[in-house]
Amino acid sequence: MKTIQLEKLDVKEGHKVLDLGCGHGRHCHAVYYHKDCQIIGVDLGFKDILIAREGFTAYPDLTGQSKSVFGLGVADALHLPFANNTFDRVICSEVLEHIPDYLYAIDEILRVTKPGGRIGISVPRFWPEKICWFLSADYHNEPGGHIRIFRATELEDDFTS
């Protein structure tokens, strides 16, 4: 299931796109097969990167017409290995709720996004997440799990301040 609407992100041919916290690559694959562009997926989990790679090799471009290029690697959202103003679009789907210093991750996202670039962010909705936390103390104590619940206005403020 994609949690970022690519139509709203408005990926154009030739764009350079970062999928931060790509996991198994669902958004990487969607962008790669959607537009002729360069998609870079990064995640902390090496096993996740291997699974994401399988998605590209399982469905290769058999026409030979695609100009899309992909790259995958292990990277930390707090220390992205990219120059300033590298990406036209950045996807960060269901990631920020896992990061203790998420404000620094936001700074990194803004740093690598070109002026005028677009950023697609998704986090779990407030009330369903709140209910999960209420029903199970273990839910938010899981290593690497959700450590924060966002309200939409709070997250918007974090990106615009």
Regions found by a protein language model. Give the residues of each.
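S-adenosyl-L-methionine-dependent methyltransferase catalytic module, highlighting the catalytic core
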Residues: R26, G55-Y59, L78, P100-E108, ...
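A short His-aromatic
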Residues: E94-H98
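Conserved N-terminal segment of class I S-adenosyl-L-methionine
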Residues: M1-A83, R89-S93, L103-I106, G145-I149
